[in-house]
Amino acid sequence: MEEIKVFVADERHIKYVDTILDTIERAAKIRGTGIAKRSPEYVKQKMLERKAIIALDGDKFAGFCYIESWSNKQFVANSGLIVVDTYRGHGLAKRIKRKAFELSRERFPEAKIFGLTT
């Protein structure tokens, strides 16, 4: 699992937006749960703002999460966590969440941090 790289997403990762959204939708259907829909533009913007975490196995998408702040940056949440099913059970979600926490602390050092499932 260490060969999978987890890092802050940027404009180079926009090509993964449709895959990310498809993976989230498939996971929700399998679980039979509703999930907040995110538009391609929203996910793309998170990448351009460097407020997203992506995990890649070479050039293959493995996982994703993003951060969102509110109340004048007093609060920050990580949300939209998804790990491709073939990569589950190996601690990848933990690595993505850890990177999201580090990014949150870097970007919003005084904020209270939450994890949200929507």
Task: Please provide the spans of the model-predicted regions.
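Short strand-loop junctions, especially beta-strand C-caps/beta-turns
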Residues: 7-9, 81, 86
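A structural micro-motif
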Residues: 2-4, 50, 111
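A structural signal for short coil/turn segments at secondary-structure junctions
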Residues: 107-108
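A conserved beta-strand-loop-helix scaffold within acyl/acetyltransferase catalytic domains
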Residues: 25, 31-83
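Conserved beta-strand-loop-alpha-helix junction that forms the acyl-donor binding cleft
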Residues: 113-118
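Alpha-helical elements of Rossmann-like donor-binding domains used by nucleotide-donor carbohydrate transfer enzymes
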Residues: 19-23, 42, 95, 99
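Conserved acetyl-CoA-binding loop-helix of GNAT-fold acetyltransferases
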Residues: 83, 89-104
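Short amphipathic alpha-helix that is part of the acyltransferase structural core
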Residues: 1-38
